[in-house]
Amino acid sequence: MELKKIDHDLTVCKVESENELDLTKDFYFIGKTEEEISLVCITDDVPTHTLEREDGWKAFRIQGVLDFSLIGILSKISTILAENKIGIFVVSTYNTDYVLVKKEKFNAALDLLEEKGYVIVE
C-alpha cells in the first residue's frame, strides 16, 4: 500500500463561527458539531481568530480511492505507530484517509511503516 507525504505543516484548531472559514483554500478539513467547529489546515492558512490551536503536525494520505468495504487499513497503521509510542490524528474524505503525526515524530513514523512494507511516495 502506498502512503503519500503531504508537503505542508498543518494545524488543528477550533474557530468560533463559520465566518472564520475560507473555503477557497486547498487543504481544509472542517468538523462541525453542536459543541464546536474544528479545522485542520495548512499552518499558513489558519484563520486570524481561533479559540484554540495546535501547530506542528505533518501528514500522509493513503494513496488511491478506498472502497468503504475495506476493513482494517487504519487499524494496521495505528497499531504499528502506537506500538512505537507515536500518536496520530486522522481525518477522512470520501475517497481516502489522512493521518497526521506530530512533526518531531513524522520521519520515524514513515520509517516504521516502510519497514512494515508500506511504500512512501513523495
At which residue positions do the language-model features occur?
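A cross-kingdom feature marking solvent-exposed beta-strand/loop segments within repeated
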Residues: 84-99, 105
